[in-house]
Every structure is written in structure tokens, then in C-alpha cells.
């Protein structure tokens, strides 16, 4: 809604600049501008109007180039306003308002660009790698319920997974607060364990971006309204271990082919449960995987994840359901994230897979 309102505002501001063109060309002698305008200035008024119109349209289309066009239009517009200050000084107000939105939008763009750059680095690192086929023999060291799960997921006789791109839509909340909607995109790379998660949440009527980065045991998390104001900023320490749990959770639920990884030590519990210890450098985390009779993974439970808000460790679980076929792989399309506090379980996240793709380039 606000996007349409702002685009209309910029568009109208651009149209108003045609008044200068009309004044110079004598098309309308009853314009609000009473001061004389030199004829060569007509082209500048016309160009400024077109820049604002183009910026408005590109803003609606979510094309980043609107930022550059807006800055150029504002500079030209303010130059023209100064040349006829007595009649056009009020035009400074919309220029300032548009500039404010440009600055805030540029901050968000720069913040997301950091994520995009890190994704490109990850993609470049595996560009020349050719994945081998995952075979039945690769499953033999795994506990039987894990073997059944990988067969059910459809990973056998398909390429090993080097990376995965996932798009989510869902909801999140904090304890004692209302749900807020979000969309997210993430890339995981598995040779050097990497998780790059970029989220856009709707909070307080605005889009609030968040970026989680995990690289080989080192984690950081930033949530920045407009990409400028640090609402949350955490790195290293207990976050490293907490996000190692998250990375392994992603492997189990979203990239089951990676469960043959040698950094995982498996222990069979029974026909429907298995325990795993996942180690990255000096960090080891433990999780229990729960399966049903047909081989589906239905829950992931770990006691090694920290709730960053209060720096305490609680049981963490992610029950999943609604298995669907994604490009030939059977994966859970819906999942929830729960903290198990002393007073009871609390669901803080609901995730729906919008799209998933392996070995992207």
C-alpha cells in the first residue's frame, strides 16, 4: 500500500515539473511560476520530470536503479527550484521527503548487497566442482531409520549436494509478542559449512531486514531496520554453537543427501530414532532425529541451541510435516520451530517452503 502511495507522490511531483516546460514554451501563461525562465532551461525541466516519472515506475517494479534516477532528479529539481525560488520554494519539501526515502532505501539495498556478495563468493568457490553420484553404498554406515529416510527423500543415484537455495514464507514471534510475517532466501554450502540467511520481516508497518551468516563455525546475526539502525547485532560466542545446530537442522530437513557427511557421528537408538553428533572445528552439537513408519523425518530435537535473547540454552525442536515433491525430492513443505522452556513449549516460527533448488550456479 505504502509503495503505491509513495510512487504516486513521486509521479505527481514529476508531473508538476512540466509546469516549467509550459512556462518556457508559452503553452500556458497562467502557471504558478511568475518569474522568467530562460528558454534553454526547458530541456532541464523536461528531463527532471521524466526522471521522476521513471523513478516512480521503477520503484513500483522494485528495480534498484530507481535510487540513482531519484537522486539525479532531486539534484536537478532543487537547482530549478533555486532558480525560481520565490515561486517554487515549496517544491523543496517533496524533494526532502523523497530524498529521505532514498536514503533509507539505499541503506536496505546496501545491507542486502552484503548478503548477495557473500552468496556470490560461495558460488564461485564451487563453480568448478562436479558432484559425484550418491549411491546405496554411501548409506551403509548410517543407522537404518536414516537410511530409510534418505531413500524416501529420493537422494539415491542423484548428485551429491554441494549447495542449496531455499525460499521461505512464514511467521515468527518473540515470547509475549504477536506473530509477524516474513519472507526469506538462504543459501547453504556444505564443503565448508556455510549458511547465509536473509529475511525480510513486516514489523511496525515497515519491512525490517535481517541477515544471519555462518561460515565454518563462525556466526553473526544482524537485524537492521532500513539497513541502518541496529536492532539486533550478535556474533561469535554462544551464537557459534547455536547456529551450528541450525546448520545441522538445515542439513537434516532441507538437504538430506548431506547426511552422509563424515563430520557426523551416528548412533542408532531404535527403529524410528537416531542420534547424531555434528562437529565443525572445535564445536560439537548433538541432535536426535525422529522418524515415522514410512521413513519420513518428523522431528529434530537438540539441547545444544541457545536462545540468544536471554543467552540460555533450552531444548529446541522442529516438527515438520506436509511432505511434497520438490524437483524429484520428497521434502517437508511445512515446519515449526519451538523452544521448550521450563514452563512449556513455545512455537516461535512457522516455515513454508516456497522453492528449493540444489547445486545452483
Spans of model-derived segments:
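Gly/Pro-enriched, hydrophobic low-complexity segments
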Residues: 275-358
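N-terminal leader/targeting segments and the immediate start of mature chains
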Residues: 115-165
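N-terminal mature ectodomain segment of secretory-pathway/periplasmic proteins
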Residues: 147-227
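Short, solvent-exposed aromatic-acidic interface loops
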Residues: 200-206, 224-230, 303-307, 336-342
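Membrane-interface extramembranous regions
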Residues: 1-114
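N-terminal trafficking/processing presequences and adjacent post-cleavage segments
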Residues: 111-136, 218-236
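Short, solvent-exposed coil/turn segments at beta-strand boundaries
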Residues: 161, 185-198, 210-221, 269-272, ...
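Flexible, processing/modification-adjacent segments and terminal tails
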Residues: 222-280
Amino acid at each position: 500500500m505504502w509503495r503505491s502511495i509513495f510512487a504516486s507522490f513521486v509521479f505527481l511531483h514529476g508531473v508538476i515539473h512540466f509546469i516549467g516546460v509550459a512556462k518556457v514554451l508559452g503553452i500556458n501563461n497562467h502557471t504558478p511560476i511568475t518569474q522568467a525562465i530562460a528558454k534553454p532551461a526547458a530541456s532541464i525541466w523536461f528531463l527532471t520530470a521524466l526522471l521522476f516519472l521513471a523513478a516512480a515506475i521503477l520503484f513500483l517494479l522494485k528495480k534498484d536503479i530507481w535510487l540513482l534516477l531519484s537522486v539525479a532528479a532531486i539534484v536537478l529539481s532543487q537547482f530549478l527550484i533555486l532558480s525560481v525560488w520565490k515561486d517554487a520554494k515549496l517544491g523543496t519539501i517533496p524533494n526532502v521527503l523523497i530524498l529521505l526515502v532514498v536514503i533509507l532505501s539505499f541503506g536496505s539495498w546496501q545491507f542486502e548487497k552484503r548478503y548477495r556478495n557473500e552468496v556470490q563468493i560461495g558460488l564461485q568457490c564451487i563453480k568448478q566442482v562436479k558432484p559425484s553420484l550418491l549411491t546405496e553404498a554411501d548409506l551403509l554406515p548410517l543407522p537404518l531409520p536414516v537410511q530409510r529416510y534418505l531413500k524416501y527423500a529420493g537422494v539415491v543415484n542423484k548428485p551429491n549436494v554441494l549447495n542449496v537455495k531455499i525460499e521461505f514464507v512464514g511467521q515468527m514471534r518473540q515470547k509475549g509478542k504477536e506473530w509477524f510475517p516474513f519472507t526469506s532466501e538462504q543459501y547453504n554450502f556444505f564443503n565448508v559449512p556455510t549458511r547465509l540467511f536473509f529475511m525480510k520481516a513486516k514489523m511496525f508497518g515497515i519491512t525490517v531486514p535481517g541477515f544471519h551468516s555462518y561460515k565454518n563455525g563462525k556466526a553473526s546475526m544482524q537485524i537492521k531496520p532500513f539497513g541502518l539502525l541496529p536492532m539486533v547485532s550478535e556474533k561469535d560466542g554462544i551464537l557459534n554453537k547455536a547456529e551450528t545446530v541450525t546448520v545441522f537442522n538445515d542439513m537434516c530437513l532441507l538437504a538430506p543427501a548431506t547426511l552422509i557427511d563424515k563430520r557426523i557421528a551416528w548412533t542408532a537408538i531404535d527403529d524410528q530414532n537416531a542420534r547424531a553428533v555434528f562437529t565443525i572445528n572445535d564445536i560439537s552439537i548433538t541432535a536426535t532425529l525422529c522418524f515415522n513408519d514410512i521413513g519420513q523425518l518428523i522431528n529434530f530435537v537438540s539441547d545444544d541451541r541457545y536462545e540468544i535473547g536471554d543467552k540460555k540454552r533450552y531444548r529446541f525442536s522442529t516438527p515438520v510435516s506436509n511432505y511434497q515433491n520438490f524437483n524429484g525430492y520428497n521434502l517437508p513443505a511445512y515446519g515449526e520451530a519451538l523452544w521448550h522452556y521450563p514452563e512449556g513449549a513455545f512455537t516461535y516460527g512457522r516455515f513454508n517452503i516456497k522453492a528449493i533448488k540444489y547445486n545452483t550456479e
